[in-house]
From Swiss-Prot:
PROSITE patterns: SPASE_II. GO terms for biological process: proteolysis. GO terms for cellular component: plasma membrane. Belongs to the peptidase A8 family. This is Lipoprotein signal peptidase. It is a multi-pass membrane protein. It comes from the Bacteria. It catalyses: Release of signal peptides from bacterial membrane prolipoproteins. Hydrolyzes -Xaa-Yaa-Zaa-|-(S,diacylglyceryl)Cys-, in which Xaa is hydrophobic (preferably Leu), and Yaa (Ala or Ser) and Zaa (Gly or Ala) have small, neutral side chains. The keyword Hydrolase applies. The keyword Hydrolase applies. The gene is lspA. Its EC number is 3.4.23.36.
């Protein structure tokens, strides 16, 4: 990836990290832990602390996962950066998808460093069925992964 094109993706990454950071800050300042605030019929704000990974995997462990996930996150972030440096300018969708994943990984890493857990608050639901509670960083990672899967599916 040429240096002059870095700034576009760096701005996207910083924007997502900033929105993620301040949305979590707002939740911390306005909702108590486990407090729920209805936004509209399929969306609640629900303040939870995730001590594990995606879908609360490992959250029931006795604390070792905190250090494991911290180190794992750093390794993933460094690997993504290394991969992105090798991209060519024409790989715009790839660069964007990895930028979204990188931004989400950094956003959640900031939480792990600051609090020892990740702040989740987006509760999508239909009647009594609730999807796993997530945050902006998680959503960014999800969209980036969908883009990669879609690109790989249609190129195979």
């Amino acid at each position: 990836m040429k240096r002059k094109y870095y700034w576009i993706y760096i701005n996207i990454i910083f924007f997502i990290i900033t929105v993620d950071f301040y949305s979590k800050k707002w939740i911390l300042n306005h909702l108590n832990i486990y407090e729920k605030q209805k936004v509209f019929f399929i969306l609640n704000l629900f303040h939870v602390h995730n001590f594990g990974a995606a879908f609360s995997i490992l959250s029931d462990q006795n604390g070792w996962q905190k250090y494991f996930l911290l180190i794992f996150s750093i390794i993933i972030i460094l690997a993504i950066i290394k991969i992105m440096i090798k991209f060519k300018k024409k790989d715009k969708n790839k660069i964007l998808s990895y930028s979204l994943i990188l931004a989400g990984a950094i956003g959640n890493l900031i939480d792990r460093i600051n609090y020892g857990f990740v702040i989740d608050f987006i509760d999508l639901h239909f009647k009594s069925w609730h999807f796993a509670t997530f945050n902006i960083a998680d959503f960014s990672i999800f969209i980036g992964m969908i883009m990669i899967i879609k690109k790989n599916y249609y190129n195979s």
